[in-house]
Amino acid sequence: MQNYDVVVVGGGHAGCEAAAAAARVGAKTLLVTHKVESIGEMSCNPAIGGIAKGVVVREVDALDGLMGKVIDKSSIHSIILNRSKGPAVWGPRAQADREVYKPTMRDMVLHYENLTVISEEVVDFTVDGVEERPQISSVLLSNGELIKTTRLVFATGTFLGGTIHVGNESFPAGRIGDKPSTKLPQALTAHGFQLGRLKTGTPPRIDRDSINWSKLLEQKGDVLPTPFSFMSECVSLPQISCYVTHTNEKTHEIIRRNLHLAGSRCESLLDVMAPRYCPSIEEKIRRFPDHKSHQIFLEPEGLETNSVYPNGISTSCPIEVQLEMLRSINGLEQAVMLRHGYTVEYNFIDPRELYHTLETKKIKGLFCAGQINGTTGYEEAAGQGIVAGANAALSLVQNQEPLVLKRSDSYIGVMIDDLVTLGTSEPYRLFTSRAEYRLTLRSDNADMRLTEIGRAYSLVSQERFDRLSQKKQEMHALLNALKGIVATPNDIAEYDIAIAQNGEKKNAFELLSHPNINMEVLLKIWPSLRSFSAGTLALMEIEGKYAPYLKRQEADIKSFLEEENLSIPKDILYSDVYGLSKEAQEKLQAVKPFSIGAARRIPGITPAAIANILIHLRCKHKSSHKSL
């Protein structure tokens, strides 16, 4: 019998990051996937990043993950979304050449130290112990082989009990052309997990040569693409344009006429939730009947392929209806469909079954990441994968603290806290609005926030850590230089600096907080600052712009962390807490919050309930982090 420290099931975005993270920490890791050639497949949109999502990719990269490096090698259309707004909501996004992204990710994974990859299917797992929380002991493969392990990560994507729907046709599949995992859901149910169903969809693909590009609006990317990885100097491939078109009344009439035939509208799927913010075109027509048109982005899927992805018209209508719909759209009158769209439904667990480490509460050593936890999106999956994989490996080390990212230090922390505290009834995706501390959680400073944390957990290479140290030294030197330049009221008048004067002296860093002052203005007045790199100057400008607000946010974060550090013992009996209502007891017992802060975020838990818990813990002297 083979023996591995960590076994990861699934070779998608969550699984790749989980396996690589476990291997980086030092665990002997096995990645089991149905087909090795499908590792890193972009099942839907061939793009990485976006609003909030782009920050997650940079956070994954700051922890030495794979996604940022891979997209930099495969990007063909890069853009910073929300560029006209503040840096706190900038969203780096890159269209990928899918035939470059997938093999690049696959090659990285196949050549990763401490990591073995096999093409197989995990059909069951065993546990040791009959106590309340048994321990993972092995996994069973479809060929009958038993592999011994005490740490298991499920990153099953849409394959867990996956079923595809196109029109009136339904068939088992995790992705078009790939069989689902049908036995694992049974195994999870047998061990007491309650599984729900979610669905998502994808649009048809169009032949590039059948599109009348002259009728469409061109959308160019950034002239100087910004790499995702802090280790990349530039992107590798030539950049191309995307194009914009719209649906129209004729399109909508075709869809309305055939709405009853859409697979996503079949009776068995009506109560299965789809992504709220990425609805199918038939759902858009149903929900927004007054809209005359809906925007479609035509995104080439690569430099050497004819396949074009029409972003915005995910559909599960019958194939002939899909073609009719496409040909009603401006520029697509002669469209040739290379592949039809479809809806896929799949199993997920209630993420409230997880700790913040992404380990399940029911079974010790079992971790989950990605769509199995109710999320949608490559980036959300990658963020969970790196946390689950790292913690699976870290938990093997005696007395080792787990990697728990907080709401105050990362979007990954926001996402995990939302999931394990609130749960979800629909596919969860990240937005900047979900983060209370988004002025701090920016795409430009992900390495400053997380790389040192990653290094402390053996996730980050010496090379990356050294690069961060050099960057911090440069930032510190520039900050000192700016603070050392003092502008008197006379200087402000002499240099024609357009700010309100109150008679006080201001240093150059303080000047940056004024809306009319940017780094370019300071460089004209004090040319000596040009000795610093353009990248360092740009980052410092952002810090200067937000400085007054960041100071206030630091106070908010301090208050937040005080409650996060007030731990609640895992063995607490909420029925023993005096004055706690039955409803509060049930909610707290279901979530099992790790801290007072986490308990406060549970819907329905009142300030009075929190006070009762604090009194109970003080009396019992059971706080593990600090005196309560």
From Swiss-Prot:
GO molecular function: flavin adenine dinucleotide binding
Cofactor(s) needed by this chain: FAD
Keyword flag Iron-sulfur: no
Primary location: cytoplasm
Classification via SUPFAM superfamilies: FAD/NAD(P)-binding domain
Residues the entry annotates as binding NAD(+): 274-288
One GO location term (cellular component): cytosol
Cited Pfam families: GIDA, GIDA_C_1st, SAM_GIDA_C
UniProt KW Cytoplasm keyword: yes
Location(s), subcellular: Cytoplasm
Domain of life the protein comes from: Bacteria
InterPro entries with a match to the protein in the record: FAD/NAD-bd_sf (IPR036188), GIDA_C_N (IPR049312), MnmG (IPR004416), MnmG-rel (IPR002218), MnmG-rel_CS (IPR020595), MnmG_C (IPR026904), MnmG_C_subdom (IPR047001), MnmG_C_subdom_sf (IPR044920)
Binding site for FAD: 10-15, 122, 181, 371
Assigned keywords, A-Z: Cytoplasm, FAD, Flavoprotein, NAD, tRNA processing
GO biological process: tRNA methylation; tRNA wobble uridine modification
Reported function: NAD-binding protein involved in the addition of a carboxymethylaminomethyl (cmnm) group at the wobble position (U34) of certain tRNAs, forming tRNA-cmnm(5)s(2)U34.
Subunit structure comment from the entry: Homodimer. Heterotetramer of two MnmE and two MnmG subunits.
Family: Belongs to the MnmG family.
PANTHER family cross-referenced by the UniProt entry: GLUCOSE INHIBITED DIVISION PROTEIN A, PROTEIN MTO1 HOMOLOG, MITOCHONDRIAL
HAMAP family, alphabetized: MnmG_GidA (MF_00129)
Name under which the protein is recorded: tRNA uridine 5-carboxymethylaminomethyl modification enzyme MnmG
Organism: Anaplasma phagocytophilum (strain HZ)
Biological classification of the source: Bacteria, Pseudomonadati, Pseudomonadota, Alphaproteobacteria, Rickettsiales
